């Protein structure tokens, strides 16, 4: 008894007097399933074998009911219809009718009209709008099957109705196919699909299969009056079991409504969403943050990203060609953030930019902007890498700086002075000329401006070599390049020079080189890899060391250094306006030349190691533009030979 009580509070009476109270079990209609334990007690009089049967409602207690006198069928009724009385319907549905089905029927008068509620049965009906058919549908659930009835023509879904009877699919389909009046529905919610048959035929099938009471109130003529209304939910008349059942069905009805596009259920959610959206919008102060975050938040991030992404291009261009120090910081920050979490870059860039501001950002930007803009974003990321690797060797920083330094152009002027270049400028006056021939570092601050147009194309080639030389130059720290005398000539190719300068930035040792590198950084940006530039350094070292003012101290004449592989790009950079065209050709050669001092010896005077230059005399043309072509050639020849 106790166990039974535990199953259902409603059933305690059953528990106490399971047999006598069998009817009481009817009270919990919804709990009929759980009530089966009491049934088992009821069944005890009959046969414990039925204890298991309770799960199968049909067999519940027909035998039990017979022996106990209290038809366990009531338990069946509970399952289907919580009626304390023996329910013939239950027995009919139950497979055990063979045992005591007749007996159970006898006590209970079977309602063939479907208008009378079985004892203890409470109507549970839901309605949804069947948009496709333009009609309301009343739904009654029996044995877990939702049987629908149309409001307009009162046709009933025969497929679902026969499913309640537990009929096999083949038999069910055969019966429905033989129906003269039928409406086949193949599209729509699952509970509305099937073969719809007239009300009368459905009632006949229900009576024949003895499921009429289970389907109550499906066949009630005024079924609309029995509709469940949320306001009725609290009525005391509705038993807790009924409430539970109703609650359980609510989801079903809601689903049905969704499928049928029920107006009430679906609308509220949409309304809520709209409200939440509108409220945030309307009252962004308090709700906007919260309400918007769910929906708009995605949008907002999108906006932020949009700003970020657009900004980098603008910043990049500004950095390259523009000297917006603020924008350069922002740009590096924004770009870096997008690609790499550029904050480190932005920070490093800011620092390095300050140092490398001297780079020829102001002048470089024009040409650099063109290349840098296209490459800028990618290179910025690459540069960011150099920054990290660079800090050890500063070249990276300078490269980064070069990029950001573009933005800092205004700073670059004084920064350059801060950098070794300013002092170099005096020293490099001669070297500057030579370097002009190289077209490398000499571009310095002022050079940057001119180089933009022609060198850009060259920068790409020069970057690799330039970077290589740059690293050497960086070691040289003091760059004869600083001499800005060449700035004018170099300036046009400053971007190319920048690559060379970039090489020096790799060296980072020399502040000047870094600024130039910064200028070249644009080129580097194009190359996007400081490393490629560093590759050049070995060859450029040989030459640059000689040609650099530092190189001279090393015993390498700055002239030779300039002729060095780095020099070739430099010449292209300096390229002096005519040299630019040559520089481009030279670049092709440069790829080869950096490794070939021989070419330099022949005609690479001015630091250009280019077969073409030697053969075509392009170098000569470019050098003609050079302020000190003769010196450069002499230096180049001497330095290269000395190196060898």
Swiss-Prot record:
Keywords, in A-Z order: Conidiation, DNA-binding, Nucleus, Sporulation, Transcription, Transcription regulation, Virulence
Positions of disulphide bridges: none
Start and end residues of each stretch annotated as Nuclear localization domain: 584-612
Matching InterPro entries: EFG1/Phd1/StuA, HTH_APSES_sf, KilA/APSES_HTH, Tscrpt_reg_HTH_APSES-type
Alphabetized SUPFAM superfamilies for the sequence: DNA-binding domain of Mlu1-box binding protein MBP1 (SSF54616)
Entry's Gene Ontology BP terms: conidium formation; sporulation resulting in formation of a cellular spore
Effect of inactivating the gene: Produces thick white aerial hyphae but impairs sporulation. Affects the expression of genes involved in central carbon metabolism including glycolysis, the TCA cycle, and amino acid synthesis. Decreases pathogenicity after inoculation of detached wheat leaves.
Annotated segments matching region Disordered: 18-58, 86-120, 239-644
Primary location group: nucleus
Positions with biased composition (Polar residues): 38-47, 253-269, 334-357, 371-383, 395-404, 525-544, 635-644
Gene Ontology MF term list: DNA binding
Highest taxon above the source species: Eukaryota
Compartments it resides in: Nucleus
Compositional bias segments (type: Basic and acidic residues): 456-465
Domain HTH APSES-type: 124-230
Biased composition (Low complexity): 18-33, 87-104, 315-328, 509-524
Cited PANTHER family: PROTEIN SOK2-RELATED
UniProt record similarity statement: Belongs to the EFG1/PHD1/stuA family.
Purpose: Transcription factor that regulates asexual reproduction. Binds the StuA-response elements (StRE) with the consensus sequence 5'-(A/T)CGCG(T/A)N(A/C)-3' at the promoters of target genes. Required for pathogenicity and positively regulates the synthesis of the mycotoxin alternariol. Acts as a positive regulator of Tox3 but is not required for the expression of ToxA. Also acts as a central regulator of carbon metabolism including glycolysis, the TCA cycle, and amino acid synthesis.
Record-given protein name: Cell pattern formation-associated protein StuA
Organism: Phaeosphaeria nodorum (strain SN15 / ATCC MYA-4574 / FGSC 10173)
The gene coding this protein: StuA
């Amino acid at each position: 008894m106790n166990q039974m009580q535990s199953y259902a509070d409603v059933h305690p009476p059953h528990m106490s007097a399971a047999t006598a109270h069998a009817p009481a079990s009817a009270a919990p209609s919804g709990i009929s399933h759980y009530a089966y334990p009491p049934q088992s007690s009821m069944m005890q009089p009959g046969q414990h074998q039925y204890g298991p049967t309770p799960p199968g409602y049909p067999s519940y207690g027909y035998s039990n009911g017979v022996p106990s006198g209290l038809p366990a069928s009531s338990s069946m009724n509970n399952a289907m219809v919580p009626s304390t009385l023996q329910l013939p319907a239950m027995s009919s549905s139950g497979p055990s009718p063979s045992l005591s089905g007749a007996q159970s029927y006898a006590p209970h008068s079977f309602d063939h009209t479907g208008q009378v509620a079985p004892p203890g049965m409470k109507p549970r009906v839901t309605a949804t709008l069947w948009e496709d058919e333009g009609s309301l549908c009343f739904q009654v659930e029996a044995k877990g099957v939702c049987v629908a009835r149309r409001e307009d023509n009162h046709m009933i879904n025969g497929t679902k109705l026969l499913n309640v009877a537990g009929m096999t699919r083949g038999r069910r389909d055969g019966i429905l196919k033989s129906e003269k009046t039928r409406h086949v529905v193949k599209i729509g919610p699952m509970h509305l699909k099937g073969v719809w048959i007239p009300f009368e035929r459905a009632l006949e099938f229900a009576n024949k299969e003895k499921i009429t009471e289970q389907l109550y109130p499906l066949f009630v003529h005024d079924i609309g009056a029995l509709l469940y209304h949320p306001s009725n939910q609290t009525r005391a008349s509705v038993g807790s079991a009924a409430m539970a059942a109703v609650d359980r069905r609510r989801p079903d009805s809601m689903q049905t409504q969704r499928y049928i596009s029920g107006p009430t259920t679906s609308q509220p959610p949409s309304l809520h969403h709209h409200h939440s959206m509108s409220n945030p919008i309307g009252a962004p102060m308090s709700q906007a943050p919260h309400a918007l975050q769910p929906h708009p938040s995605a949008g907002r991030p999108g906006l932020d990203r949009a700003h970020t992404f657009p900004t980098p291009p603008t910043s990049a261009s500004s950095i390259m060609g523009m000297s917006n120090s603020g924008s350069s910081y922002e740009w590096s920050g924004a770009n870096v953030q997008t690609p790499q979490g550029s904050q480190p870059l932005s920070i490093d860039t800011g620092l390095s930019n300050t140092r490398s501001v001297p780079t020829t950002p102001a002048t470089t930007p024009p040409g650099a902007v063109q290349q840098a803009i296209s490459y800028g974003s990618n290179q910025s990321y690459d540069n960011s890498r150099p920054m990290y690797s660079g800090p050890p060797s500063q070249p990276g920083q300078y490269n980064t700086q070069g990029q950001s330094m573009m933005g800092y152009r205004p700073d670059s002027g004084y920064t350059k002075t801060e950098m070794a270049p300013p002092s170099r400028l005096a020293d490099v006056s001669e070297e500057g000329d030579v370097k002009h021939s190289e077209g490398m570092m000499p571009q310095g601050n002022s050079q940057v401006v001119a180089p933009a147009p022609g060198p850009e194309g060259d920068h790409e080639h020069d970057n690799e070599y330039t970077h290589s030389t740059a690293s050497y130059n960086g070691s040289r720290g003091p760059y004869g390049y600083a001499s800005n005398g060449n700035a004018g000539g170099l300036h046009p190719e400053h971007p190319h020079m920048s690559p060379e300068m970039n090489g020096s930035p790799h060296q980072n040792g020399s502040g000047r080189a870094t600024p130039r590198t910064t200028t070249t950084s644009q080129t580097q940006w194009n190359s996007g890899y400081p490393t490629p530039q560093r590759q050049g350094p070995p060859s450029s070292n040989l030459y640059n060391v000689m040609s650099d003012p530092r190189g001279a101290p090393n015993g390498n004449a700055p002239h030779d250094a300039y002729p060095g592989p780095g020099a070739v790009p430099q010449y292209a950079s300096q390229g002096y306006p005519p040299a630019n065209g040559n520089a481009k050709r030279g670049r092709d050669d440069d790829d080869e030349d950096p490794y070939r001092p021989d070419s330099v010896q022949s005609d690479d005077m001015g630091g250009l190691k280019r077969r073409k230059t030697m053969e075509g005399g392009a170098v000569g043309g470019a050098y003609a533009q050079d302020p000190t072509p003769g010196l450069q050639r002499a230096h180049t020849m001497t330095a290269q030979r000395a190196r060898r």
